[in-house]
Amino acid sequence: MTFTIDLKDQCIIVTGGNRGIGLAMSQACADAGAAVGIIYNSAKDAEDRASEISKKYGVKCKAYQCDVGQQHKVKEVFKKINEELGPVTGLIANAGVSVVKEALQYNKDDFNKIFDVNVFGVFNCAQAMAQIWTDTGFQRGSVVIISSMSSQICNRPLTQCFYNSSKAAVSNLGKCLAAEWAEKSIRVNMLSPGYVKTDQTSHMDQKLRDFQADGVPLKRFAEPEEMAGQAILLLSPKASYMTGGEYFVDGGNLVW
């Protein structure tokens, strides 16, 4: 028996899909045969990344500007993607931000900035997608929420209690949505990366990166591409009985 994951004739929306983990997932979806709608907020290179993906993999791929924290805007853009590239069959809710400060320095603006994207933004995207599927009667929708191993741990010596808390919140949000939307045949799962070579980890000096990598059983940070396989599986029919789960792709960090 041959086991392959094929997303041909599918369409996937990837928020934050023009860089880091999101870009790797956009590329992986396209490589598996899916059309891809990349959501970006302010990056100038998003349209270039979409064009490159389209040419390399021979699929439709377009970039759409959208602040995921604006509920009405998300609904408008998702409807547009569904009309232009769709029907959309899956969502990777990847967009996220972090502010690294000591707890005594945080303020409400920091909280709002992080939770508006990492929690409310994820909800907006999942809600908009689920509404489209409900309205059109589509019953095989899959949502993959990119959380973090920080949903479970504090990641010392980094001081990012708001980020960690937002990931704990979004992981539980995903479980709640999975339970509520199961009757609609909409699956919701969380993929929680460990340390990955992205812009978010590039601020660390080499000494800190070495310290963090030494705490991982596999003794290294992951490449963004190493996150994509699990996401593709969760989007595919091969995972048709998987919902409400949180899957850690962390090099064994949580068992160390």
From Swiss-Prot:
Q: What class of enzyme is it?
A: oxidoreductase
Instruction: Supply the PROSITE patterns for this chain.
Output: ADH_SHORT (PS00061)
Provide the alphabetized UniProt keywords. Answer: NADP, Oxidoreductase
Q: Which residues bind NADP(+)?
A: 21, 49, 67, 94, 163, 167, 196, 198, 200
Q: What is its EC number?
A: 1.1.1.138
Read off the CDD domains from this record: MDH-like_SDR_c
Catalytic activity, per the record? Answer: D-mannitol + NADP(+) = D-fructose + NADPH + H(+)
Record-linked InterPro entries: NAD(P)-bd_dom_sf, Sc_DH/Rdtase_CS, SDR_fam
Gene3D superfamilies referenced in this protein's UniProt entry, alphabetically: NAD(P)-binding Rossmann-like Domain
Q: Which residues form the active site?
A: 148 (proton donor), 163 (proton acceptor), 167 (lowers pka of active site tyr)
Record's keyword annotation contains Oxidoreductase: yes
User: Which GO molecular function terms does the record list?
Assistant: mannitol 2-dehydrogenase (NADP+) activity; NADP binding; oxidoreductase activity, acting on NAD(P)H, oxygen as acceptor
Chain ranges passing through the membrane: none
Q: Does the keyword Metal-binding apply?
A: no
Q: Which family does it belong to?
A: Belongs to the short-chain dehydrogenases/reductases (SDR) family.
Q: Which PANTHER family match?
A: BENZIL REDUCTASE (PTHR43008), NADP-DEPENDENT MANNITOL DEHYDROGENASE (PTHR43008:SF6)
- What is the recorded function of this protein according to its Swiss-Prot or TrEMBL entry? May be involved in hexitol or pentitol metabolism.
Q: What is this protein called?
A: Probable NADP-dependent mannitol dehydrogenase
Q: Which organism is it from?
A: Uromyces fabae (Rust fungus)
Taxonomy, top ranks, is: Eukaryota, Fungi, Dikarya, Basidiomycota, Pucciniomycotina
